[in-house]
Every structure is written in C-alpha cells, then in structure tokens.
C-alpha cells in the first residue's frame, strides 16, 4: 500500500521569519542538486525568492551574517531558507554533504544574490 508523509509544511523559514507572498510573473521551477565538500564555507549570499532543501547525506550549518544565529541540518532533514537575509552554508564535517534544493521561481530570476563584500569580515 502506498503512503504519503508530509515532511515539511510551514509558513516560516528555519529561523522563524515569516515567508513573503509568492512572486508574480511567469513561473519557473528549478531543482538543483548541491554537493558541499568537507570543511567548506559557501559564499555569503541572500535569496529574493523562497527555496527549500532536503539533505540527502552529510550535514551542514546555515549561518546568518548579521545575527548570532545558526542551525545544524543532517541527512533526512528538510529546511525552508530565509528570504532577504544574508547567510551561508558551512560544511564543518569531514564528509561531503548532498542536498536537493527546490526553487519556486519566476522566469530568469537569479536563485541567489552574492555578497562578496562580506567575505572580508567572515
């Protein structure tokens, strides 16, 4: 017998921020597989759209730039990303982390906006 289990149903990002209204415009769904090598920090960035991820294997942290806030995620976890907050992912472990990231976007919208000016102050 087939079953369905809801693994995430929320109106908040992982840090408790309320999600914005959906974007207006021609829809485009993007699904990416992300591989984060061991001991790797991703660049600082933010998203202007909602995104969701499922951790297939490994573990990582999401760290907010302007707040002393971070959260740990591991294989089997799901998360709803922040919108508009500068953050980065950090794989502090000795193993690769694999995620599938879902972006309900609109045509030609960037999935993330880099903040290279933040790299100096890490």
Label for each model-derived stretch:
Residues 36, 66-84:
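Short acidic-glycine-tyrosine-enriched beta hairpin
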Residues 31, 50, 84:
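Short coil/loop residues immediately preceding or within conserved phosphate-binding loops
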Residues 62-64, 87, 109-113:
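Substrate-binding/catalytic groove segments of enzymes
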Residues 47-67, 77:
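Glycine- and acidic-residue-biased ligand/ion/polar-headgroup-sensing regions
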Residues 1-33, 72, 79, 115-122:
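A short, N-terminal "cap"/entry segment at the start of jelly-roll beta-barrel domains
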Residues 24-27, 39-52:
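A short beta-loop-beta micro-motif enriched in histidine and acidic residues
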Residues 69, 83-109:
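Ligand-binding loop in jelly-roll beta-barrel domains
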């Amino acid at each position: 017998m087939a079953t369905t289990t809801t693994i995430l149903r929320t109106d908040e990002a992982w840090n408790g921020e309320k999600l914005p209204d959906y974007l207006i415009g021609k829809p485009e769904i993007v699904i990416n597989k992300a591989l984060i090598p061991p001991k790797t920090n991703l660049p600082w960035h933010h998203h202007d759209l909602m995104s969701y991820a499922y951790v297939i294997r490994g573990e990582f942290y999401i760290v907010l730039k302007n707040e002393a806030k971070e959260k740990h995620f591991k294989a089997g976890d799901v998360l709803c990303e922040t919108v508009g907050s500068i953050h980065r992912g950090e794989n502090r472990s000795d193993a690769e982390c694999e995620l599938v990231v879902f972006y309900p976007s609109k045509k030609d919208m960037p999935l993330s906006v880099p903040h290279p000016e933040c790299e100096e102050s890490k």
